[in-house]
């Protein structure tokens, strides 16, 4: 009984593995990353002390919109 349910669930999940779902998740991950970039949090590598991250780049200007 349980094995049958598992097989049905796998069959239902199959169409989403390569197609729409992965595209959706990739898009979501990209928008999360770009959202972090615009807020000035995402810098790789992290900025030196005294510099803030703006749009993914380090800047020594005072960044007043980051709540620290």
Swiss-Prot record:
Q: Which domain of life is it from?
A: Eukaryota
Q: In which tissues is it expressed?
A: Expressed by the venom duct.
Q: What is the protein's known function?
A: Probable neurotoxin with unknown target. Possibly targets ion channels.
GO MF entries: ion channel regulator activity; toxin activity
Proregion span(s)? 22-38
Asked if the record carries the keyword Cytoplasm, the reply is no
Protein species of origin: Californiconus californicus (California cone)
Q: How is it modified after translation?
A: Contains 2 disulfide bonds.
Q: What is this protein called?
A: Conotoxin Cal14.13a
UniProtKB keywords: Amidation, Disulfide bond, Ion channel impairing toxin, Neurotoxin, Secreted, Signal, Toxin
**Where found, per UniProt?**
Secreted
What cellular-component terms does GO give this entry?
extracellular region
Q: What is known of its domains?
A: The cysteine framework is XIV (C-C-C-C).
On this chain, the residues bearing Valine amide are 66
Is Transferase included in the keywords of this UniProt record? Answer: no
Task: Look up the signal peptide feature and give its range.
Answer: 1-21
């Amino acid at each position: 009984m349980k094995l049958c349910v598992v097989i049905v669930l796998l069959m239902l999940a199959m169409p989403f593995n390569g197609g729409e779902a992965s595209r959706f998740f990739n898009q979501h991950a990209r928008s999360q990353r770009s959202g972090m970039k615009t807020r000035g949090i995402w810098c790789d590598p992290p900025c030196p002390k005294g510099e803030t991250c703006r749009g993914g780049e380090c800047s020594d200007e005072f960044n007043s919109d980051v709540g620290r």
